[in-house]
Amino acid sequence: MKKVMLVFGTRPEAIKMCPLVKELKKYKEFDVSVCVTGQHRQMLDQVLNTFNIEPDYDLSIMKQGQTLFDVTINILERIKLVLKEVKPDLVLVHGDTSTTFATALACFYLQISVGHIEAGLRTYNIDSPYPEEFNRQAVGIIAKYNFAPTEISRQNLLREGKDNSNIYVTGNTAIDALKITVKKDYFHPELEWAKDSRLIMLTAHRRENLGKPMHNMFKAIKQIIDEYRDVKVIYPIHMNPIVRKAAEEELGNCDRIHIINPLDVLDFHNFLANSYLILTDSGGIQEEAPSLGKPVLVMRETTERPEGIKAGTLRLVGTNTERIYKNFKLLLDNNEEYNRMSHASNPYGDGTACQKIVKILLNKEI
């Protein structure tokens, strides 16, 4: 029996790893354990509850005001004890978080094999996104098995000298999650409030966008709201107090913008499915929205998901107020442009990524 441990700590990781946990547990060939770091606490627990997953280990590292130093040190110290106790044959980590980086580093020190889910995403700008671009490149050096969501991700890994025999294009597990969470008969009072309008879903929280860029983003949205009476915005706001302060200053006095607490994953995915278009600086939404046929304006200067840009489902609009406004306005005014983006092909797979990963692991001597 192969001892496989999955380690994750944030809400986005959990959304993409929980379907894989459930798929692995279907097979008697695997002894599966789950360790969460609690890098996000409340938001992580919501996802675990949605997928009905009980972690075997919880490092509970979350504290107010932690720096990247604190997070990394705490994970390294605590995950070491768990790894020494469990002695897994393989540890699976996801993406580019501090949890992923610190866990992979601990595995390297203990000579435990690492499998990297969502491997090969790159901007090649070490400062954007920060610190995620460094994290995923570092994990790429450590990982023995690389599960790339797309061919572009695979090519990135090959250019970096990774072993072709251990790179697998699987699609993105985010699409697997959507197949579980999105419901045709879903109801929520907020969606009732927005049902006679064009609903815009907004997410904004990235570290590199704090300060002036975020204020610029919000100013563009407020300008659109002032001009288009048939548009409403729902913004499930991040817990970061800097984000909350900026949102209150720029968006707080408009009755067609609802700033709400973070949604659990089932609610959030169904809000996306019922929206008209999406404005975001998130990574995961760039993968999820195309599967739902929703155009996405990406409020960042770079993206590690060029597949969506190439396919036409995403448009990179940066953090300049005028640029965001013009692209937002175009999609509201031009049906042809809107339809081109909403009907573009989804480059992130068909929702069978977890099955593919498990099949690969079944055939590997790990």
Residue ranges and their predicted role:
Residues 1-235, 240-366:
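Nucleotide-activated sugar donor-binding and catalytic core shared by glycosyltransferases
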